């Protein structure tokens, strides 16, 4: 469906597009093309104003029940009006008078083609659209947006590239085409903060109709923005809620979905056309109940995110529109061209609002000498922060590879620098509180973070990035630090330059950067289980295909050996994380154990009941050797004795030397086996 977005339906960015009500005199002076633009108003008017409406007679005038109160009456016969009263907005016949809107209400019946609308119908649609506040113009003021979506406060002023008229037209054409859309743009153009809002607007106006060429029945479904982490769900939903002029969730078009969501974050009066901010896990549980699917941070290749892409592609007829958003297609463009059916690629040009300066700090040690390289890096970091210091009241972000390094670098910096130090990563629960301290402090704040802060979170007062250029890539029973890819570098650099000019200080040679194929270092059971649930053909229906298919097939055989029915697996998938697939054997035993185990997976709280249950699974590891690392850490070289990776070597750190065997509780907790 090729359809351009008329100017009158632009989303009000409150910069050069404002909410606007058109007069009948303005309509009279318009060209035919401009007048015809109002024909598309029939779709939002049918959904949001005329649904369940009827004809009434009010003071002798036929009107729609949404215009005035009155007794329900049979509609009059309609021919060409004898006279038009532009002031009263009425068509006058010899025997009756009818409002412009009521005339249109009676004429706009199912299967009527919109290009058949005459001037009389269009005038009524203009009035109905004015009442809904769905029109816009290049002149106006912010306060005109109050009430557009039931909001008590005006929309935010947004100068970002994604809400320019040009970008709005391009995004609308792609959305209405029902083709899968891959949307890229420089960090800071408003992909995460504005494009979902724009798609919400299009969904509010036109979502649920099979075509915009004629009037049909509609099936209204919300938009969903699927995100890899709960913190992102909370942050982005709050940003868009405020920018749409709301202060509370109830009654707004914004809803949140994630596990163990608190009562105060549940929208008890959601809108059918609204937007749901959800974790990937919960997006999959009701994927086909949404009309427009937006998957953000595609470049991260979050496992469940990649599975959603595979499922949506396999069942694309069940979704009206799919948007994949990423800062860069450095690693994925060719795969997406082949994988998606006839995709549309949209790039929103633009850069951060403010200039970003780059500074390279050379590390004279070769990274193959890991410990010496890191020690030199820490010394360089102190020097760099002293030379390139955020102003008072501002902050800098230090990107390191892992949670352990966050604590290591924070401890090192605190002894040498007089600034406020904070740690933020995916397991930190009080991020909002930390950010409030950062924003309210008159001092310099230094935030040490994992790659967690790469993703879309805009810290308002950050002026400096100090990038170590590494990421920890988890692998079954271990993992390794790798140098980042170009897309990760772009994300980190783009954390500054949004609110103020910024400085990006990097401590790694650019030649070290490389693409990271995450699926080759992941447990693969989710791919198997969701493939079974959604009838995916393996491996060809996967977005990213593992290099070693033997592991995929061994995983399938291992899952089959559990003797758990497909129906039960589907229930487990919908309700539990199952970070270790063996936990499934415990989840099916009893509801009480399932509740405690689920709490352990979510919070890390390990009760004796859960520990004993996991120990009963006999997830045994043989200790081959060990060596002393430092005062309270010993490195143990081990062999896995269970599951898909039986026989695989693993390295495990423990606070004292061990021999014999240990049992695995989780990917980070191990219990020595008593040799007596």
From Swiss-Prot:
Subcellular location: Virion
Residue ranges of domain Helicase C-terminal in the record: 366-535
UniProt GO MF annotations: ATP binding; ATP hydrolysis activity; RNA binding; RNA helicase activity
EC identifiers of the protein: 3.6.4.13
Induction / repression: Expressed both early and late in the viral replicative cycle.
Broad EC category: hydrolase
Domain Helicase ATP-binding: 172-347
The entry's keywords: ATP-binding, Early protein, Helicase, Hydrolase, Late protein, Nucleotide-binding, Transcription, Virion
UniProt short sequence motif DEXH box, positions renumbered to this chain: 296-299
GO cellular component, one term: virion component
PANTHER family for the chain: ATP-DEPENDENT RNA HELICASE (PTHR18934), ATP-DEPENDENT RNA HELICASE DHX37-RELATED (PTHR18934:SF99)
Family, as annotated: Belongs to the DEAD box helicase family. DEAH subfamily.
Purpose of the protein: NTP-dependent helicase that catalyzes unidirectional unwinding of 3'tailed duplex RNAs and plays an important role during transcription of early mRNAs, presumably by preventing R-loop formation behind the elongating RNA polymerase. Might also play a role in the export of newly synthesized mRNA chains out of the core into the cytoplasm. Required for replication and propagation of viral particles.
Protein name, UniProt field: RNA helicase NPH-II
Species of provenance: Vaccinia virus (strain Ankara) (VACV)
Gene: OPG084
